[in-house]
Each structure stands twice: as structure tokens, then as C-alpha cells.
UniProtKB/Swiss-Prot annotation:
Organism of origin: Parasynechococcus marenigrum (strain WH8102)
GO MF annotations in UniProt: imidazoleglycerol-phosphate dehydratase activity
Disulfide bonds: none
Pathway: Amino-acid biosynthesis; L-histidine biosynthesis; L-histidine from 5-phospho-alpha-D-ribose 1-diphosphate: step 6/9
Keywords of this entry: Amino-acid biosynthesis, Cytoplasm, Histidine biosynthesis, Lyase
Entry's EC annotation: 4.2.1.19
GO CC, any one term: cytoplasm
Source organism, top-level taxon: Bacteria
GO annotation terms (biological process): L-histidine biosynthetic process
Gene behind the chain: hisB
UniProt-recorded name of the protein: Imidazoleglycerol-phosphate dehydratase
InterPro entries reported for this sequence: IGPD_sf, ImidazoleglycerolP_deHydtase, ImidazoleglycerP_deHydtase_CS, Ribosomal_Su5_D2-typ_SF
Length: 202
């Protein structure tokens, strides 16, 4: 059974389309109008082996906030849709990714219980034209719409680009670990309760 999500979200501020395949090969087409966000979406796809097709048109003439957030919402919804009842997955994932002097650790649980614990200390306010406070806003949107429990910890780093890119790489590898099928589970739901919540899977 294909583990795919297909979301089209339209508001007065943005028009976002996301297609996602958890069992992909890392193919990515991302056009959001926010170049640094596109670069980070490529990290999720490439290192998570998730096929992503994302197109967004938003009010970037004002700023990148609405587009950044709505892309995160749509990615979270597509992820929830692709996971369904989360039957047969490993559920938990953890990875620490270095990028030169930066080291970021991510742990996550596909629990259906949205929570973000975030401790990046990004020195600069901007990376190119991208406002670095939008990194957290992206993950807030993903978490709230996918039902992930997500912990992000910066262990080292002084270069803003390196810190953020290491974060996205660690997230992608932890997500891949958590969402891959566990052959020992034989299709069972990975919970002692026998059920996991399906936040965002509308």
C-alpha cells in the first residue's frame, strides 16, 4: 500500500500544494518563492529518502512568514496522511547530524501527540533574505499538523547556515528512521495501547 500524502491548501495569503511519498528515493521539486526554505526542503527529501513535490505561491512581497508557515502546515498534513494509523512503523527516531562546527540532535516520536521542544541558538537574524526565527515556526507547523513529538537540540555551532542545515538533516534522518517499516512488527500498531492518534490526517 502506497504511503503517500497529497495536500492542497488555499488561504487568502497562500496557495500551497504538497505531494509526499515516504517510500521514495529522495527526489525533490520545491518551488515556494522562499529560496532558503527550498534548500531545506531538499535536505528533508534527500536525507530522508522522501519524494517531495512542493509548489507554493504566497504574499512574499510582505514577508516570508505566511508561506513558510503554510508550507509547514501542508507538509505536516501530508505526512499524517501518508502515515495513516502508523501501522508497522518503527515509530521512534533519533539522529545527530554534524555540519562542520555545528552539531544538532533530533529525537522524534510519531505518537499523534504534537509537541515541539526547540533549543537552536542561531546567531544571525537572517540567512540571506530568510528570517531565522522562521525555522521554529516551520517546525511548529509541521508538528501541530502531523502529530509528531519532536525534540531539537543544538550541541555545538556558531555559523547560522550550518546550524539550521544540520537541524534539517538530523530531522530528515530521524524521520526516516521512525517512519520506516519494522519487519518484526508484522503490521501491528507500535503502541501498547493498540492505537495512535492521527493528528492532521483529515
Amino acid at each position: 500500500m502506497a504511503r503517500q500524502g497529497d495536500i492542497h491548501r488555499v488561504t487568502g495569503e497562500t496557495d500551497v500544494k504538497v505531494r509526499l511519498d515516504l517510500d521514495g528515493s529522495g527526489q525533490c521539486q520545491a518551488s515556494t518563492g522562499v529560496p532558503f526554505l527550498d534548500h531545506m526542503l531538499h535536505q528533508i527529501s534527500s536525507h530522508g529518502l522522501i519524494d517531495l513535490e512542493i509548489n507554493a505561491v504566497g504574499d512574499t512581497h510582505i514577508d516570508d512568514h505566511h508561506t513558510n508557515e503554510d508550507v509547514g502546515i501542508a507538509v505536516g498534513q501530508a505526512l499524517a496522511q501518508a502515515l495513516g494509523d502508523r501501522r508497522g512503523i518503527h515509530r521512534f527516531g533519533h539522529f545527530a547530524a554534524p555540519l562542520d562546527e555545528a552539531l544538532v540532535q533530533v529525537a522524534l516520536d510519531c505518537s499523534g501527540r504534537p509537541h515541539l521542544s526547540y533549543s537552536l541558538s542561531i546567531p544571525s537574524q537572517k540567512i540571506g533574505s530568510y528570517d531565522t526565527e522562521l525555522v521554529k515556526e516551520f517546525f511548529v507547523a509541521v508538528v501541530n499538523n502531523s502529530g509528531l513529538t519532536l525534540h531539537i537540540r543544538q550541541l555545538d555551532g556558531v555559523n547560522s547556515h550550518h546550524i539550521v542545515e544540520a537541524c534539517f538533516k538530523a530531522f530528515s534522518r530521524a524521520l526516516r528512521m521512525a517512519t520506516e517499516i519494522d519487519p518484526r512488527r508484522a503490521g501491528a500498531i507500535p503502541s501498547s495501547k493498540g492505537v495512535l492518534e492521527q493528528a492532521g490526517a483529515n
